[in-house]
Amino acid sequence: MSLFVTFEGPEGSGKSTQARLLYESLYARRYPVILTREPGGTRIGDLIRRIVLDLQHTEMAPTTETLLFSAARAQLVSEVIRPYLEQGGIVLCDRYADSTYAYQGYGLGRDLAELRTITAAATGGLRPDITFYLDISAEDGLERKRRKHPGARLMGQRGVDQEWNRLDARELEYHQRVEAGYRALIAQDPERWRVLDARQSIEALAEQIAAIVEPYLASIPQLEAVPYS
């Protein structure tokens, strides 16, 4: 048996922190676990990440953006996710295909049927067992992220902090469409999603996530020793 867990949410939701904390907990308990992210997680994926998130690439067409994210995903599934799952391990992924539906589909207005076709090709139909959604409004999430990067501005303005990426910098209305898109996705597949209030403390969220994952661990054998990182 294996386990595939993904983390989704608007900007500033804290999903990356929670993915890392779950990874550290499972690793310490000697479970075979890896943590990866989208876009990225492979040499090719990291190169794509630099291109697709670069603030200077304001001329990028929506189709280009969609295909770049999907190319990074295809490489990640082929090189990292599927092989590790086939070995019976646990894969934690910071964003996955749902981000494409939310950000490029609902956010940019790309045709959802077309996105499903592209995603099926990129993933080979691989779906998560659990998807955690860290729930926070677009407004509150962006404010959180701006507090971390005080030089941040909206798209097209000067003086943007380099850690504030091209998608972060889009107008509030875009992020509101993304948030609404996530809610539509959750309604379509409620059994897979676990919705958690991202306004809680980091510790409270980590405890809830660990409790949800725990029953799935019964079928996954622990390693005899903690592997080298």
UniProtKB/Swiss-Prot annotation:
Superkingdom, according to UniProt? Bacteria
GO BP annotations of the record are: dTDP biosynthetic process; dTTP biosynthetic process; dUDP biosynthetic process
Q: Which InterPro entries match?
A: P-loop_NTPase, Thymidylate_kin-like_dom, Thymidylate_kin_CS, Thymidylate_kinase
Q: Which PROSITE patterns does this UniProt record tie to the protein?
A: THYMIDYLATE_KINASE (PS01331)
Reaction equation(s) it catalyzes: dTMP + ATP = dTDP + ADP
Q: Which Pfam families match?
A: Thymidylate_kin
Q: Which residues bind ATP?
A: G9, P10, E11, G12, S13, G14, K15, S16
A single GO CC term for this protein reads: cytosol
Keywords on this record?
ATP-binding, Kinase, Nucleotide biosynthesis, Nucleotide-binding, Transferase
Give the family per the record: Belongs to the thymidylate kinase family.
Functional description taken from the UniProt entry: Phosphorylation of dTMP to form dTDP in both de novo and salvage pathways of dTTP synthesis.
Spell out the protein name for this chain. Answer: Thymidylate kinase
